[in-house]
A protein has these predicted regions:
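Class I Rossmann-like S-adenosyl-L-methionine
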Residues: 1-181
Length: 181
């Protein structure tokens, strides 16, 4: 199993089946015996995609004619993983992210799904300015949710409880990836 395929299966297990990401990731790493580089890529792809679900789902909502909840779980996992690579992994060439996503959609879905994935991912590259996060002044809850990877309901609760300034501080704190010992 290649790295992207392993990440795809992990995302399906977590997002569709409700598995715990840390357990899924540990099992895959033990089973697959990835090289150090592949292990780091796999881990970033899974955890990064999960951390960025708000933003990648926001993009899907803007670009897709279909509602996110009506998409096949295979299609949704492939799109999320592809969009994460396009928008957050600067060392992954866009062509590789798109092509590999299409291969996954074709292998685990069908040709129609592969075409849909290809169209949405390539469209996201052409329409980056349309996909900009609303400013804080336009929509503070959506801005903080997408920027700092927190759920909107939680942002609303924090703003009510602590005010906007302290909410920004909380968002920054909880989005910080801890340093390794």
């Amino acid at each position: 199993m290649n790295v992207r395929e392993a990440a795809f299966h992990s995302l399906i297990a977590v997002c569709k089946d409700g598995a715990y990401s840390n357990i899924v990731v540990s099992k895959i790493i033990q089973k697959e015996k990835f090289t150090d580089r592949d292990r780091r890529f796999y881990t970033e792809l899974v955890y990064g995609t999960l951390r960025s679900l708000n933003y990648v789902d926001y993009i899907i909502g803007i670009l897709s004619s279909r509602k996110k909840n009506s998409l096949d779980p295979v299609c949704l996992a492939v799109l999320r993983m592809g969009l994460y690579q396009l928008f957050f992994m600067d060392k992954v060439p866009p062509s590789a992210a798109c092509n590999e996503a299409v291969k996954l959609a074709r292998r685990f879905g069908n040709e129609g799904m592969a075409k849909f994935v290809n169209a949405l991912l390539r469209n996201s590259l052409r329409q980056k300015e349309r996909l900009a996060i609303p400013t804080f002044d336009e929509n503070p809850v959506l801005h903080l949710s997408l920027t700092w990877h927190q759920q909107s309901w939680l942002i609303e609760k924090w703003i009510t409880e602590f005010g906007q300034e302290h909410t920004v501080t909380l968002c920054r704190y909880f989005d910080t990836i801890p340093e390794l010992c």
